């Protein structure tokens, strides 16, 4: 029987499952190199943690790793039901909050290594977390697309740690009771991008679709469709970073000004940015709450031990 130790949290309603132990050794390379080893040789550990019967489509996994740099607090590899993520904002907030719960860090500034670079996270005295993300930028503005069943769509392509297609003029109602329609629309957009061969820089797959709408209490409300068909319950850290890159490029938000991004369920991130060569460096602040500590058990004769559909 195999055992995998986990600690679950949620950030603004979006769950993160931190894997503390039980995965095979991935070597001593960078987080990107270790992610590649995990994907190539041990992917069934991802599916065991994330897919049913132990997980769900909305769950994001985070494998805790020893960092390469001696001044880093931890390394982490993010994954979900469809594969691997370069970076995850809500997940980083959850990881930092959980590291404090484990007694590994105190309030202060900490460096976290990810497959797309090292991010700086500040654990505040109230246990909220600010994540200084990897650089973000807008790759293309006003990209036109024809989506069957919906007609013409125009959006921006931006990098915030993952690739996003951001749409403000979409005609959809961004609300928690309209998730099914939002999912269908965003999924059709993503399929349209793939059919048209539209990508991020260097052929990067645009696997996140982000829809924006006005919000009576905050600067914006968003719906984010993640890889697969799960939507982000949080405002999405990498998605908010991509949004800031577009706002900065359009001159609509000054460096240091706070942008309050609400999610489709009403949870909120506070975000700002500083300028950097070719783009911006965003900072996202939010809170995570602990929800479980558990040991996942994988019996040798369990036909679904490594996940349904794996």
Swiss-Prot record:
Binding residues for substrate: 89-90, 208, 232, 237-238
Keyword Isomerase: yes
Residue stretches in coiled coil: none
Catalytic EC class: isomerase
Enzyme Commission identifier(s): 5.1.1.8
A Pfam family recorded for this sequence: Pro_racemase
Keyword Isomerase assigned: yes
UniProt KW keywords: Isomerase
InterPro entries linked: Pro_racemase_fam (IPR008794)
Superkingdom of the source species: Bacteria
Catalysed conversion reaction: trans-4-hydroxy-L-proline = cis-4-hydroxy-D-proline
List of catalytic residues: 88 (proton acceptor), 236 (proton donor)
Gene Ontology MF annotations: 4-hydroxyproline epimerase activity
Function comment: Catalyzes the epimerization of trans-4-hydroxy-L-proline (t4LHyp) to cis-4-hydroxy-D-proline (c4DHyp). Is likely involved in a degradation pathway that converts t4LHyp to alpha-ketoglutarate. Displays no proline racemase activity.
Family assignment from sequence similarity: Belongs to the proline racemase family.
The name this protein goes by in its record: 4-hydroxyproline 2-epimerase
């Amino acid at each position: 029987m195999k055992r995998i130790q986990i600690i679950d949290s949620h950030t603004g309603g979006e769950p993160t499952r931190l894997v503390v132990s039980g995965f095979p050794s991935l070597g001593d390379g960078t987080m990107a190199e270790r992610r590649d080893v995990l994907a190539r040789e041990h992917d069934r550990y991802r599916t065991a943690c994330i897919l049913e019967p132990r997980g769900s489509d909305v769950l994001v996994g985070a494998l805790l790793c020893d960092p390469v740099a001696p001044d880093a607090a931890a390394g982490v590899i993010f994954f979900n039901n469809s594969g691997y993520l370069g970076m995850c904002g809500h997940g980083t907030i959850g990881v930092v909050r959980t590291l404090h719960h484990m007694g590994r860090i105190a309030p202060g500034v900490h460096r976290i290594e990810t497959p797309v670079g090292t991010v700086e996270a500040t654990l505040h005295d109230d246990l909220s977390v600010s994540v200084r993300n990897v650089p973000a930028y807008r790759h293309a503005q006003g990209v036109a697309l024809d989506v069957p069943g919906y007609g013409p769509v125009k959006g921006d392509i931006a990098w915030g740690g993952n690739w996003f297609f951001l749409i403000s003029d979409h005609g959809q109602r961004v609300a928690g009771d309209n998730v099914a329609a939002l999912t269908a629309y965003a999924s059709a957009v993503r399929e349209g991008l793939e059919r048209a061969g539209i990508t991020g820089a260097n052929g990067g797959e645009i696997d996140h679709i982000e829809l924006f709408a006005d919000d009576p209490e905050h600067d914006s409300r968003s719906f984010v469709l993640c890889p697969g068909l799960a939507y982000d319950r949080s405002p999405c850290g990498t998605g908010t970073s991509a949004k800031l890159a577009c706002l900065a490029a359009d001159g609509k938000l000054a460096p240091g000004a706070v942008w309050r991004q609400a999610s489709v369920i009403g949870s909120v991130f506070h975000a700002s940015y500083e300028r950097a060569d070719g783009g911006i460096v965003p900072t996202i602040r939010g809170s995570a709450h602990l929800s479980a500590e558990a040991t996942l058990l994988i019996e040798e004769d369990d036909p679904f031990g490594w996940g349904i559909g794996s």
